[in-house]
């Protein structure tokens, strides 16, 4: 299982191809599946829902992590956020993982920026439940 971050959405110096494209096309699907991390896909400049759909049958797990832009903090304006607190379209992402045959979703937030992690998790849970995720 391969878990993405942002650097897979950069072009390789020698190949001139996106690293994620090479992983998808050059590794046998029987040998490796993908765990798509929504935050890191967006951070890399791609659309998480589009990637999940592209990986139909190869993406049994998705990590839900929202992507927030906070202009009040000039030192680091991009933050991980509780689901529904950022800019990602989770309705579209849910539709994509249903299409792709994804079996598991993990809610993840690496940094809560001083907030109680359980409060962040509760916000994510309530938001995703409102979207119909069971």
Predicted feature locations:
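Conserved anion-binding
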Residues: 1-10, 19-20
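Histidine-acidic metal/acid-base catalytic patches
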Residues: 17-36, 40-134
């Amino acid at each position: 299982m391969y878990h993405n971050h942002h650097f897979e959405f950069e072009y390789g110096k020698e190949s001139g191809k996106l690293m994620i494209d090479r992983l998808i096309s050059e590794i046998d699907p029987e040998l490796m599946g993908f765990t798509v991390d929504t935050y890191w896909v967006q951070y890399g400049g791609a659309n998480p829902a589009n990637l999940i759909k592209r990986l139909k049958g190869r993406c049994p797990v998705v990590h839900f992590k929202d992507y927030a832009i906070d202009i009040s903090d000039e030192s680091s304006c991009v933050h991980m956020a509780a689901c529904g607190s950022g800019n990602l379209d989770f309705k579209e992402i849910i539709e994509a993982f249903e299409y792709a045959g994804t079996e598991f979703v993990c809610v993840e937030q690496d940094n809560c920026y001083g907030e109680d992690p359980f409060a962040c998790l509760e916000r994510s849970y309530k938001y995703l439940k409102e979207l119909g995720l069971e």
